[in-house]
């Protein structure tokens, strides 16, 4: 009976340890996925800001551009 108790406790302990390791790896994988998603979103924002900056530069450049004198005949 004593041998059976030790065996059961050993099996339960090893099962809990392996479950704990699997949960830890799962959390790490989820964190990596979140980091990847955040990096992709950041890249998209940088691209959008670059385009908006160019458009704003063109618009503002057109507004403050000196107008040419046009003479009518």
UniProtKB/Swiss-Prot annotation:
GO cellular component: extracellular region
Compositional bias per record (Acidic residues), positions renumbered to this chain: 30-42
Function summary: Antimicrobial peptide with activity against both Gram-positive and Gram-negative bacteria.
Signal peptide location: 1-22
Family that this chain belongs to: Belongs to the frog skin active peptide (FSAP) family. Frenatin subfamily.
Subcellular location: Secreted
Region named Disordered: 25-45
Top-rank taxon: Eukaryota
Keyword Signal: yes
InterPro entries assigned to the protein according to its UniProt record, in alphabetical order: Frog_antimicrobial_propeptide (IPR004275), FSAP (IPR016322)
Name used for this protein in its record: Frenatin 3.1
One matching Pfam family: FSAP_sig_propep
Tissue-wise expression: Expressed by the skin glands.
Primary location group: secreted
Propeptide residue range(s): 23-46
GO process terms (BP): defense response to bacterium; innate immune response
Keyword terms: Amphibian defense peptide, Antibiotic, Antimicrobial, Immunity, Innate immunity, Secreted, Signal
Species assigned in the record: Nyctimystes infrafrenatus
